[in-house]
Curated annotation (Swiss-Prot):
GO terms for cellular component: mitochondrion; plasma membrane. InterPro entries: At_inactive_RLKs, Kinase-like_dom_sf, Leu-rich_rpt, Leu-rich_rpt_typical-subtyp, LRR_dom_sf, LRR_N_plant-typ, Prot_kinase_dom, Protein_kinase_ATP_BS. This is Putative inactive receptor-like protein kinase At1g64210. It is a single-pass type I membrane protein.
Length: 587
């Protein structure tokens, strides 16, 4: 009878979700929430589920819920049946770090679109049912740090799209099934009660993924030389050893007598690999809270930012920049700020101003975090990298793909539009340089690191003198203006044209002369009417006949780097001049 009721419920649930709407999704989540006493979410019937519900994301059409992120909200008890499972378009579900109890929800089989499931750090228990073959789109499954027991279900082999599997720190027992998961790149079965050997299909993973179990090492069949059987090979090897020892003994006794052989053991220094960027055990720093922009909320928490695998992109005067992959496999840039000289209130005010800037050519500030020990700014990630990397990386190498003139013109156009948007709000950037200009998918330049100079300690005078990007007046005042931004942007234009780094370098120094930056070098060359010699050979070697356009851009760049700031154009004028060279939008 119980089995009949179970299958009847599943069929009924399937009928209900087959014609579901956003309103039905909303009712399902309200039903879910009604089982708990949580005041943190602020969900209600009258509010807009797609834009104001904490942790909820809708699809582009705004007609279905596709993501529910509710980590560490404080839920207690069972996951209410037939609530979340009614979200038939759900792709991402994170309920980690709560206090859920009971079995794995059997009705999750209805979540056919689910790609990411995070239930780690709860108190779920019992055996896992053989239901995973129904979730064929699942890419990430994390059930670690619970109390699941029994055997690991063989139905996991049906998850042919699975890339990450984490079942660590449970009480699974028995042997590890031979899981044939072609796309699996990460697995963790450590700290369970598993026995037997690691199956052949999983032997490509590191042993640490299986530590803390009662596994025995699989004996590998060793091949012997010349195709001999192992017994024959051992007999021949033994005979050879006897002959060698006998011969050596005879030589030592008859010819050399007793000799001493001394040796020395060399100790090898062991060095541990560089540690990952990890968070503290708690994130309860005074007032620490992530603030999101754009009507979005609860997209990630501090643990996501600090505990995820992070790749260092660079270190600069304002701090260290990391590339962080989130649990939903999206990527953001996290800048860990140092030398912040303003208090919380001024920091938050500045971040709010930056967060209101919305433009396709300005890197979006997604969120920020302020506490006594950490100040973080979270930005969009551009997978094409920065202009500095593209322009100067691997220069001279055979596999380098040079930037053509069309690409450089798009970069200049996009960056000018971004800076014009910033200046439009009477705002100052203060640190324009090629490493702060990123390339979008269409190769337009996008301005990053907006507004950080106003909350950071002033750059030292030596940095201003040697960077090559800063206007002459910055050396004395160390205060940025919109005209100093224009100067820095002009240097970027010259950098695009010449392919040379603005920082003082030997190739820009005349024989017996003093060091000069890029702008000074170009002024000296143009004064001698050798204009053609400044252009990057990577552009000149390409066909197209763009020399006239390049000369126009050179004149714009030189106007921007005028020594007197009152002689420099406004960025809006610069943008118009660049767009007048040639329209790149229609290409």
């Amino acid at each position: 009878m119980q089995i009949f009721l179970f299958f009847f419920s599943l069929i009924l649930c399937f009928v209900l979700i087959s014609s579901q709407t956003l309103e039905d999704d909303k009712k399902a989540l309200l039903h879910f929430l009604s089982s708990f006493n949580s005041s943190r979410l602020h969900w209600n019937q009258s509010s807009d589920v797609c834009h104001s519900w904490t942790g909820v994301t809708c699809n582009e059409n705004g007609d279905r819920i596709v993501s529910v992120r509710l980590p560490a909200v404080g839920f207690n008890g069972l996951i209410p049946p037939f609530t979340i499972s009614r979200l038939s378009s759900l792709k991402f579900l994170s309920l980690r770090k709560n206090h859920f109890t009971g079995d794995f929800p059997s009705d999750f089989t209805n979540l056919k679109s689910l790609t990411h499931l995070y239930l780690q750090h709860n108190h779920l228990s019992g055996p896992l049912l053989a239901i995973f073959s129904e979730l064929k789109n699942l890419k990430v499954l994390d059930l670690s740090n619970n109390g699941f027991n029994g055997s690991i279900p063989t139905s996991l082999s049906g998850l042919t799209s699975l890339q990450v599997l984490n079942l660590a720190n449970n009480s699974f027992s028995g042997e590890i099934p031979n899981l044939h998961l072609p796309k699996l790149s990460q697995i963790n079965l450590s700290n369970n009660k598993l026995i037997g050997t690691i199956p052949k299909s999983l032997q490509r993973f590191q042993s640490s993924a299986f530590s803390g179990n009662n596994l025995t090492e699989r004996k590998k069949q060793r091949k012997t030389p010349f195709g001999l059987s192992q017994l024959a090979f051992l007999l021949i090897l033994s005979a050879a050893c006897v002959l060698c020892v006998s011969g050596l003994s005879f030589i030592m006794i008859t010819c050399f007598g007793k000799t001493r052989i001394s040796g020395k053991l060399r100790k090898r220094d062991s060095s541990s690999p560089p540690g990952n960027w990890t968070s503290r055990d708690d994130n309860t720093e005074e007032g620490g809270k992530i603030i999101f922009f754009g009507g979005r909320n609860h997209l990630f928490d501090l643990d996501d930012l600090l505990s995820s695998s992070a790749e260092v992109l660079g270190k600069g005067a304002f701090g260290t920049t990391y590339k962080v992959t989130m649990e939903d496999m999206s990527t953001v840039v996290v800048k860990r700020l140092k030398e912040v000289v303003v208090g919380r209130r001024e920091f938050e005010q500045q971040m709010e101003i930056i967060g209101m800037i919305r433009h396709e050519n300005v890197a979006e500030l997604k969120a920020y975090y302020y506490s006594k020990d950490d100040k973080l700014a979270v930005y969009s990630y551009y997978n094409h990298g920065s202009l500095f990397e593209i322009l100067h990386g691997n220069r001279g190498r055979y596999h380098r793909v040079p930037l053509d003139w069309d690409a450089r013109l798009r970069i200049a156009t996009g960056a000018a539009r971004g800076l014009a948007k910033i200046h439009e709000g009477k705002f100052i950037h203060g640190n324009i340089k090629s490493s702060n200009i990123f390339l979008d998918s269409q190769c337009y330049g996008c301005i990053g690191d907006v507004g950080l100079t106003t909350i950071m300690r002033s750059l030292p005078q030596t940095t201003c003198l040697t960077s090559g990007y800063h206007a002459p007046e910055i050396t004395d005042t160390r205060r940025s203006t919109q005209f100093s931004d224009v100067y820095s942007f002009g240097v970027v234009l010259l950098e695009l044209l010449t392919g040379k780094s603005p920082v003082s370098q030997a190739e820009l120094v005349p024989t017996g002369g003093e060091n000069m930056d890029l702008a000074s070098w170009i002024r000296s060359v143009v004064a001698k009417e050798w204009t053609g010699e400044v252009f990057d050979m990577e552009i000149l070697s390409q066909s197209g006949g763009f020399e006239e356009e390049m000369v126009e851009m050179l004149q714009i760049g030189l106007a921007c780097v005028a020594l007197k700031q009152q002689e420099r154009p406004h960025i809006a004028q610069v943008l118009k001049l660049i767009e007048d060279i040639r329209s790149v939008d229609a290409e």
